[in-house]
């Protein structure tokens, strides 16, 4: 028979129940589990007739159907259930004329070119059917708060293990219904007093660990990677056998809450919502854009699920006979109606949900960051074992693709350089700062805080960066700040760290937890990389200056004398770091020029032998490279002040390559200098055969190469020694060379672009924030109770289940990355023409000036005049001026 789902068919399930889709990634955990007979994904509970059904919700739907395409002539046949014939009277039952088949779901929009438009259509009441459903009356909490329980699809209910379904509080709908709340208030007003509540608090559960995932517009692969990693970490905690804490006072999973905060409906990827709907945390068609005309600020969904979707779209289900099954996870999904930025998302987390749940520890993750095995438990243990620990972070490393430490993404030098940066930061910077007690930045992508430690002034100062509070805060708000403070909040996590350590009367400290690891995706192209580092560099510089200027507040804290001594040492270290960063532009140029002059100019110090191209060619090549260096340095200012990185991609790629080639040349010169210093017997080189005193004198002589050797030893030796001591040296072999070649670009391109765009603080909303597609909720007075009620559509379970099939197909469909269109806008073309015009004008005039005034021109052999200095410059100028007159 023809398929009722055009364009995407369902597979028959073999009677042996050992079907598995073709693997997409051989190293995926779900794929390995599917290869074993006793795995959590091939159990007897995959059979819809072998598992006890949820009481009162008899259904033929389970999650054992395959949604990956197959024989178009076949669809799964399910038994006919008379329960759904006329549950609400005539006109509301199953009108399917084919007994034995489920009610046809809506057309599958997965092959639609615009998933957002398909999502908008699904929000309409009664989408996918021409039937009229019965309605139910829902009371508003305290007459103003709309909070409704919706039945979840039977397949999701049936996936819950019996031991959890049977161990519920009386009358609980935790596993059978999803709870939706339309929050029409500010996060600060999301309180019990105003009628808002959350399920863990309603069930009187203590929340020990609140895991928050902040999201902007990441695709479903990145989101699933993070969420599945969190589910695996919850399993690690629940499976602890000898824990003195987690196994007391109730099941461990009831002490953990996972909170997803999505920053706006418009920017979010609608395929990601399908993934959340597949595990039961979201449903289409239930959100309300306003309640009695009062705009909804955030849509809050709550459900406890045992399902998970991996990064390669494999559905993970539990098995009663397997200890590796995922335990239930209490989920809170907060979908903000408008894009209000990350700080506002954290205000929902801490001020709204945190105050109701009152967790002990909050772990912050960005969508796309995957926590490693037992990483979240390692973070929590650090807090459990240290009562004065206020914040902590783990090791973040770059995502390198298949192959682990030798992943194929390392072929991209930009990724390799970032990988080296992350590794060295985790080996040298973080442990050093952790020993002082103050880690200058706990990355927002992977960090943890003790909730009561950040309450009060730390969060108060942190939330000054929330532009939704700008009117309330006045001059202290983001709109009243000067440009320096606005940039400071681009690195808001640094502000929170400083305020936490400097909290008056407290002695909280920060720490780095080596055992906790996470991987994150990094930019792979120059435009994205430059844009990311603009925010990082400007924010970190402003935040560092803020911390140094307000260091005196440390004296009001409760730290002891030893801690204060080390904090002073760290302050001096930070001052030196800021100064070195400030003068790094000149430092790189001076290093390049001095090394070229030392090795490339024939002189008595090098036995009148220039290296590497001989006495004639080497000075010429060095001069060309030096002028190219300065020219491209000037070009960076022109590009940064007038162009977007995406509009000048080619120019930036050429700049990266040129600075890399010059750096390679300088490295060769420095190596030659070191070798020559120990092998020649020139008086200006290092003396190795006349005793220690002469060796020291020659090594540190003003004309000797000792300082170069020290710099090289500090660069090469320190990194190698520290990496091997850390037992993690692989980045030295796979990424060190790329990092060395890109070091000048990090200064000459990134810092110039960042400081040239200091005015760009990127505040304000992105996108159009369209929520007009959502229906409104209008209250009516109930004739009997005289209270405000809302009439809500009451769908039969059969229709919920049939529509769920299309949702799962969309969620588990192979991910196809969107094609990036690099079409330049008209404004980009105008800016590029302006850049070329200005660059041509400046460089042509500079070339003329250099040709007349510089003695370096003689090296090219264009003139044999014996004159030097002003005399030759005057003669050249007059010679040029004569034909003009």
Curated annotation (Swiss-Prot):
Residues 23-34 have a biased composition (Basic and acidic residues). Optimum pH is 6.0 to 10.0. Disruption phenotype: Results in significantly reduced chitin synthase activities but does not obviously affect cell morphology, growth rates, chitin contents, or virulence. If it does not affect virulence when solely disrupted, the virulence is drastically reduced in a mouse model of acute infection in a doucble CHS2-CHS3 disruptant. Leads to increased expression of the other chitin synthase genes for compensation. Residues 1-59 are annotated as: Disordered. GO terms for cellular component: cell septum; plasma membrane. InterPro entries: Chitin_synth, Chitin_synth_fun, Chitin_synth_N, Glyco_trans_2-like, Nucleotide-diphossugar_trans. The keyword Cytoplasm does not apply. Induction: Highly expressed under stress conditions, such as the shift of cells to temperatures commensurate with infection, or to conditions that induce cellular morphogenesis in this fungus. The promoter contains a negative regulatory element between -1600 and -780 bp. Optimum temperature is 25 degrees Celsius to 50 degrees Celsius. It is a multi-pass membrane protein. The keyword Ribosomal protein does not apply. One of its GO terms (biological process) is cell wall organization. It is found in: Cell membrane. Its main location: membrane. The chain crosses the membrane at residues 565-585, 620-640, 650-670, 707-727, 735-755, 837-857. It catalyses: [(1->4)-N-acetyl-beta-D-glucosaminyl](n) + UDP-N-acetyl-alpha-D-glucosamine = [(1->4)-N-acetyl-beta-D-glucosaminyl](n+1) + UDP + H(+). It comes from the Eukaryota. Pfam families: Chitin_synth_1, Chitin_synth_1N, Glyco_trans_2_3. Its EC number is 2.4.1.16. Keywords: Cell membrane, Cell wall biogenesis/degradation, Glycosyltransferase, Membrane, Transferase, Transmembrane, Transmembrane helix. Polymerizes chitin, a structural polymer of the cell wall and septum, by transferring the sugar moiety of UDP-GlcNAc to the non-reducing end of the growing chitin polymer. Is not only stable at different pH, but is also able to tolerate a broad temperature range. With CHS2, plays an important role in virulence. Belongs to the chitin synthase family. Class III subfamily. This is Chitin synthase 3. The lineage of its organism: Eukaryota, Fungi, Dikarya, Ascomycota, Pezizomycotina.
């Amino acid at each position: 028979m023809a398929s009722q789902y055009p364009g995407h068919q369902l597979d028959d399930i073999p009677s042996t129940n050992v079907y598995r889709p073709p693997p997409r990634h051989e190293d995926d955990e779900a794929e390995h589990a599917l290869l074993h007979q006793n795995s959590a994904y091939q159990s007897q509970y995959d059979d819809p007739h072998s598992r006890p059904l949820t009481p009162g919700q008899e259904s033929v739907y389970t999650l054992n159907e395959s949604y990956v395409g197959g024989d178009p002539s076949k669809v799964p046949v399910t038994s006919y259930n008379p329960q759904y014939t006329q549950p609400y009277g005539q006109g509301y039952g199953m009108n399917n004329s084919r007994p034995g088949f489920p009610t046809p779901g809506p057309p599958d929009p997965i092959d639609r070119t615009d998933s957002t438009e398909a999502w908008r259509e699904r929000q309409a009441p009664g989408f996918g059917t021409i039937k009229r459903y019965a309605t139910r009356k829902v009371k508003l909490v305290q007459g103003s708060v709309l909070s409704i329980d919706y039945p979840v699809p039977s397949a999701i209910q049936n996936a819950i293990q019996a031991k959890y379904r049977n161990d519920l509080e009386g009358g609980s709908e935790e596993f059978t219904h999803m709870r939706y709340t339309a929050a029409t208030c500010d996060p600060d007003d999301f309180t019990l007093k105003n009628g808002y509540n959350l399920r863990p608090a309603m069930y009187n559960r203590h929340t020990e660990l609140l895991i928050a995932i902040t999201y902007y517009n990441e695709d479903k692969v990145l989101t699933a990677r993070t969420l599945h990693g969190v589910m695996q970490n919850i399993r690690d905690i629940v499976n602890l056998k000898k824990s003195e804490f987690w196994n007391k006072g109730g099941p461990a999973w009831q002490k953990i809450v996972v909170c997803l905060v999505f920053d706006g409906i418009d920017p979010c990827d609608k395929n990601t919502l399908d993934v959340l709907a597949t595990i039961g945390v979201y449903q289409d068609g239930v959100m309300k854009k306003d309640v009695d005309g009062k705009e909804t600020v955030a849509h809050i969904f709550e459900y406890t699920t045992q399902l998970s979707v991996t990064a390669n779209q494999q559905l993970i289900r539990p098995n009663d006979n397997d200890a590796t099954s995922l335990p239930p996870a209490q989920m809170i999904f907060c979908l903000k109606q408008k894009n209000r930025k990350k700080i506002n998302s954290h205000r929902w987390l801490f001020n709204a949900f945190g105050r109701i749940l009152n967790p002990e520890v909050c772990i912050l993750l960005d969508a796309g960051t995957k926590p490693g095995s037992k990483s979240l438990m390692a973070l929590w243990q650090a807090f459990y074992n240290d009562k004065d620990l206020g914040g902590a972070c783990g090791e973040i490393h770059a995502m390198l693709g298949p192959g682990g430490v030798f992943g194929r993404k390392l072929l991209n030098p930009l990724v390799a350089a970032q990988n080296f940066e992350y590794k060295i930061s985790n080996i040298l910077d973080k442990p050093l700062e952790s020993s002082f007690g103050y880690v200058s930045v706990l990355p927002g992508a992977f960090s943890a805080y003790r909730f009561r430690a950040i309450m009060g002034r730390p969060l108060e100062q942190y939330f000054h960066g929330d532009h939704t509070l700008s009117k309330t805060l006045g001059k202290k708000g983001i709109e009243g700040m000067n440009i320096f403070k606005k940039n400071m909040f681009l690195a808001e996590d640094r502000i929170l760290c400083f305020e936490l350590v400097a909290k008056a009367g407290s002695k909280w400290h920060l720490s780095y937890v080596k055992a906790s690891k996470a991987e994150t995706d990094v930019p792979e192209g120059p435009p994205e990389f430059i844009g990311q580092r603009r925010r990082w560099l400007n924010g970190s510089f402003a935040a560092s200056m803020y911390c140094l200027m307000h260091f005196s507040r440390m004296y009001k804290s409760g730290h002891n004398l030893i801690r204060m001594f080390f904090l002073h040492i760290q302050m001096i270290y930070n001052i030196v770091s800021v100064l070195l960063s400030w003068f790094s532009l000149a430092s790189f140029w001076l290093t390049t020029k001095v090394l070229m002059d030392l090795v490339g100019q024939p002189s008595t110090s090098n036995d009148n032998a220039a290296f590497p191209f001989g006495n004639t060619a080497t000075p010429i090549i060095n001069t060309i490279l030096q002028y190219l260096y300065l020219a491209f340095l000037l070009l960076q200012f022109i590009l940064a002040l007038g162009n977007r990185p995406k509009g000048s991609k080619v120019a930036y790629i050429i700049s990266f390559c040129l600075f890399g080639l010059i750096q390679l040349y300088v490295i060769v010169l420095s190596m030659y200098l070191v070798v020559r210093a120990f092998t020649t017997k020139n008086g200006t080189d290092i003396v190795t055969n006349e005793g220690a005193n002469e060796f020291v004198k020659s090594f540190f002589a003003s004309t000797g190469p000792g300082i170069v050797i020290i710099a090289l030893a500090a660069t090469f030796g320190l990194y190698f020694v520290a990496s091997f001591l850390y037992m993690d040296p692989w980045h030295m072999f796979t990424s060190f060379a790329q990092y060395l070649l890109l070091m000048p670009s990090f200064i000459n391109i990134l810092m110039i672009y960042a400081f040239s765009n200091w005015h760009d603080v990127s505040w304000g909303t992105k996108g159009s924030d369209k929520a007009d597609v959502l229906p409104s909720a209008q209250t009516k007075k109930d004739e009997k109770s005289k209270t405000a009620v809302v009439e809500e559509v009451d769908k039969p379970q059969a229709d919920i289940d049939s529509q769920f099939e299309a949702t799962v197909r969309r969620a588990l469909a192979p991910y196809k990355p969107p094609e990036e269109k690099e079409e330049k806008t008209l404004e980009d073309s105008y800016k590029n023409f302006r850049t070329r015009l200005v660059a041509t004008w400046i460089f042509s005039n500079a070339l003329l000036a250099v040709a007349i005034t510089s003695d370096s021109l003689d090296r090219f052999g264009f003139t044999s005049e014996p004159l030097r200095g002003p005399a030759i410059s005057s003669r050249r100028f007059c010679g040029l001026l004569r034909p003009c007159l």
